Amino acid sequence: MKEMNSKSNIAFTLAEVLLTIGIIGVVAAMILPTVINETKEKEYAVARKKALATIGEAVRLITVKGSIRDASNAEDFVENYLKKQLQIAKTCDNNNLRDCGIETGTDKILSLAETKMTMPKTVKELASGISNGTVTDPSSTSYGFVMSNGYSVNLFYNPSCLSDDKDANHWGQDRVCVNAIYDMNGLAQPNEVGKDIGFVTVLYPDIRTQAVAPDVHKKNASSANFYNAGASCAKLDPEYTLPNRDELLAMYFNSNLLGITSGGYWSASEASAELGWGQSFDNGGRYRGSKSDGFDVRCVRR
């Protein structure tokens, strides 16, 4: 009899079991979206680093060999130069980018600002004022390809790109040799900049070549002078910092993807003891501004 009573004391009623299951379900419903979102964010961060390590390094090697300006257009560059450095499974001309998993439908992708937009197919669709560049052809078209890891890439190329100039103000767009917009999962959702869509930008046709793929915050930090711009980023989000002048130039060149249509922004790069480097998102101008001047601030995570 005692044994039977012991068993009955530890038994659960159906109501208790259902209540427990219900509580577990509620907790799971609260926690799972956060866990899934954090997992996705890590995947997007890994994709950005992979794109930078593969595309950026491949173009850098071409540059070091002195061949970065030898191609005639984006198609020639991909087919006859990039293919020697990067495993490419498929290529597509500008009229058939969707065959390479690049969504080109009208308003089918989301900018970083979460506004509907159309994937750029010509250089002039990348940023405001890009035609101000002296050696940048705004009508130049992109070329598409699929990497061996499944990433879809929409690549822009400038055979006339110029070396860096740290002694004078200049047009930033003229320093971009290659700009590659990637989509880690092709036509699949979410097709959103900052998530499955990002970009790798390669600057300068010489040994000073730089490849960057900034992870850009969705909104501006508070405007500030050069001295306080970094702190403005930290106040917005401690994981973010002020971009250097090359990262900031890449952001301008892809400003339509980011939803940044105007403004003058500080970089973290000094021009002199009194001057810092800034970037105009209105016309592409790279300028040296007084460190005491107040400009816009947009932050990045590395």
Predicted regions, residues:
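A short alpha-helix/helix-coil micro-patch that ends at or immediately precedes a cysteine
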Residues: 221-240
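Bulky hydrophobic/aromatic "packing anchor" residues in well-ordered structure
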Residues: 212, 229, 266-267
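Membrane-proximal N-terminal amphipathic helix
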Residues: 41-82
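Short, surface-exposed beta-strand/loop "edge" segments at domain boundaries and coil↔beta transitions
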Residues: 153, 186-197, 221-227, 247-250, ...
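N-terminal single-pass transmembrane signal-anchor helix
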Residues: 8-40
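C-terminal, surface-exposed recognition/capping segments
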Residues: 239, 245-302
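Intrinsically disordered, low-complexity regions enriched in Pro/Ser/Thr/Gly and acidic residues
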Residues: 76-211
